[in-house]
Amino acid sequence: MSLAHINIFLAFTVSLVGLLMYRSHLMSSLLCLEGMMLSLFVMATMVVLNTHFTLASMMPIILLVFAACERALGLSLLVMVSNTYGVDHVQNLNLLQC
Amino acid sequence: MNMFSSLMLASLSVLTLPIMSSILNTHKNSTYPHHVKNIISYAFITSLVPTMMFIHSGQETIISNWHWMTIQTLKLSLSFKLDYFSMIFVPVALFVTWSIMEFSLWYMHSDPYITRFFKYLLTFLITMMILVTANNLFQLFIGWEGVGIMSFLLIGWWYGRTDANTAALQAILYNRIGDIGFIMAMAWFLFNTNTWDLQQIFMLDPNLTNLPLLGLLLAATGKSAQFGLHPWLPSAMEGPTPVSALLHSSTMVVAGVFLLIRFHPLMENNKTIQSLTLCLGAITTLFTAICALTQNDIKKIIAFSTSSQLGLMIVTIGINQPYLAFLHICTHAFFKAMLFMCSGSIIHSLNDEQDIRKMGGLFNAMPFTTTSLIIGSLALTGMPFLTGFYSKDLIIETANTSYTNAWALLMTLIATSLTAVYSTRIIFFALLGQPRFLPLTTINENNPFLINSIKRLLIGSIFAGFFISNNIYPTTIPEMTMPIYMKLTALTVTILGFTLALELSLITHNLKLEHPTNMFKFSNLLGYYPTIMHRLPPLANLSMSQKSASLLLDSIWLENILPKSISQFQMKTSILISTQKGQIKLYFLSFLITLTLSMLLFNLHE
């Protein structure tokens, strides 16, 4: 693999590890999730442009759209947690109430 | 050229003169009630002449005056049918009304709106005459509705009293339910016989007459207070006593029976409807007689007595004897009106006391009223050779000797004996014994209006049966031969009822009052019929309509089916099946380790 690919792949892995291992704020995992989406976007665009695979050039755009939806959802959950507790510390999420 | 039709029309049209005078505003002076009473007595005397001509010659007349309109093939005109029924009923009704008008001159003396009262009574009489002399169903319906409206206005005479308003509304509602049957019959006749004229209907003699006769039976049930539509009649006693005497004993409530009698050519061919009327009348007469046994208001007892006698008339129609039913209508008018007038005399003398438990000892204090009350009760129960005997005994004899429903016959006989029981009860409580009313009495029956009116009806109660029976032409032949026990059935059960009631009253008069038994409560509360039927069906109807109108469409279909049900379902199931405790970091960490391990495993495996 070329150096650019390894770079992007490393960015993705770092974001993944950051998503799965975080200390106290829920916001940080959401940020890392965004980072993952961004690196995927760049990777997909690079591959499509390099191989001139024009038919698949829709794919990064659609990925971005779905990432936006998911961002909204994650933020709304964050807001719900923040409404209840004031801060979004993860240790607060031990009471599953409906 | 005889004056038959002219005199009859004259007699009917003089009744409308006092109503016309209200246009000229002569009705504001204080002699208006006397004026009305005199007009009615003149109308009575005038109508006697055509009646006697009719009795002499048997000539029936139809007067078709004015062609109102023709709707495609239906011709509506103003026509009067002066046959056996109307010719005999009109003088009887006018005589009774004359006496009642004179009575109400005394009874309503202190009422400020006495002229309006007399106008209402007169309007009622006019509409009743329209009903009785109608030759087509449309005119009959005009009279029918007219008597219903006047009944409403007169029952609610003291409209400041809530009970009176409720009773008037009740009368209208129950009559309306009967009117549905009437209109159904009118529609059927319009469709199948193309007319509303009685002559054409009877001539065509349609075959399947179940539906219109059922409609007419429903109309009679509503107007004549048969079982099922009966509660308005005891409630109608909220009106003044002259109203009860005129409307709800002699004239209006017999309109339903009169309708069925008018249609007797159709009814004699339809056995199903005859059985229905027989059973309906038998149930009514027994049920209302049972209810009359434990009432405490003297007017209510007499109202139930009226209802029971109406049931007896319907039974008579059910055994295919319309002429006997008509005879009973005429004779019943006399003594029932007199009973009401005597009770009015008692009520006014005891300062508006209507509870028989607070009367007593009037035997010596009011001799004239006592006499007429006892004679009226004896006539009601069918004492031989008083008025009631000529119709009631004939009815019982005919029922005994005809091929009829034994259960209906048994109920009629029991009701006959109960008639004697409650009559004895009235006499015992109101007249005999020691006085139970307050010492400061205003007992005075010396007014000539009162005495004359009751005296006229008294003579009628004694002699009218004999007089009418000897002067009518033969119609259906009564049964002439029967075993002696059948002949004496009515007399036996009546004497049995008298004796039983007297013995029971005398024995239990001084005993300690016990808690009412279930039978007592059943009889006193009118068989629980008003309690159930006035609350349960309206509540069910209204709540069902409210639920279907507002709840069903709006809240269920638009709100509950998808949105709220989904959210509730989700919440419930997520509580049910989640076993997590929210240790998110642990879950994420385990995910990462699994991922790393699996990638290492798969990549370094080679």
From Swiss-Prot, chain A:
Chain ranges passing through the membrane: 1-21, 25-45, 59-81
Reactions the enzyme catalyzes: a ubiquinone + NADH + 5 H(+)(in) = a ubiquinol + NAD(+) + 4 H(+)(out)
Superkingdom as given in the UniProt entry: Eukaryota
Keyword terms: Electron transport, Membrane, Mitochondrion, Mitochondrion inner membrane, NAD, Respiratory chain, Translocase, Transmembrane, Transmembrane helix, Transport, Ubiquinone
Membrane association type: Multi-pass membrane protein
Record GO cellular component, one term: mitochondrial inner membrane
Enzyme Commission number(s) from the entry: 7.1.1.2
One example of a Gene Ontology biological process annotation: ATP synthesis coupled electron transport
Any GO molecular function: NADH dehydrogenase (ubiquinone) activity
Subcellular location: Mitochondrion inner membrane
Assembly and binders: Core subunit of respiratory chain NADH dehydrogenase (Complex I) which is composed of 45 different subunits.
Role: Core subunit of the mitochondrial membrane respiratory chain NADH dehydrogenase (Complex I) which catalyzes electron transfer from NADH through the respiratory chain, using ubiquinone as an electron acceptor. Part of the enzyme membrane arm which is embedded in the lipid bilayer and involved in proton translocation.
Family note: Belongs to the complex I subunit 4L family.
Descriptive protein name: NADH-ubiquinone oxidoreductase chain 4L
Provenance organism: Equus asinus (Donkey)
